[in-house]
Amino acid sequence: GRFVDDYRHAWRIVEMADRPNLGTCLDSFHILSRGHDPSAIEDIPGEKIFFLQLADAPALDMDVLSWSRHHRLFPGEGSFDLTAFLGHVLRAGYAGPLSLEVFNDTFRQTDVVRTAAHARRSLTWLADRTAEAAGWSTDRLTAAAAPLAADFVEFKGENLGP
């Protein structure tokens, strides 16, 4: 934000206002891109976290505004530790809605059905990793559906030539 760019500062404002209808929105990109320690999220009562926005991003050395508007990724595709971030949020007691706030030039040009499937896979991945890290049973999570088809296959590696 222009005047408040640290979630801890935002939380202090909410505390001082002491209003039942005022809370905070946590945005993983804004917290992690600025290098803020997310552990203090656990000091915010879950009922005072009103919304959660998630995005991953590659480690880039550039202006945060440009980075934010053009290079966000789905969870698990960047360098942010979203598993730890989400763990802090859940330990705070948050059980409300979340959104993927992924601003990315490539996704803007991609078929929306493919992008939605990609988003769902990333959330399933994040739920699985977060449950494993917390030692929770993954039995309570919906099992992954068997694939019906493949739209594309992507390989990454070195020396893939003949």
In which residue ranges do the predicted regions lie?
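Conserved anion-binding
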Residues: 1
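Histidine-acidic metal/acid-base catalytic patches
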Residues: 4-26, 32-162
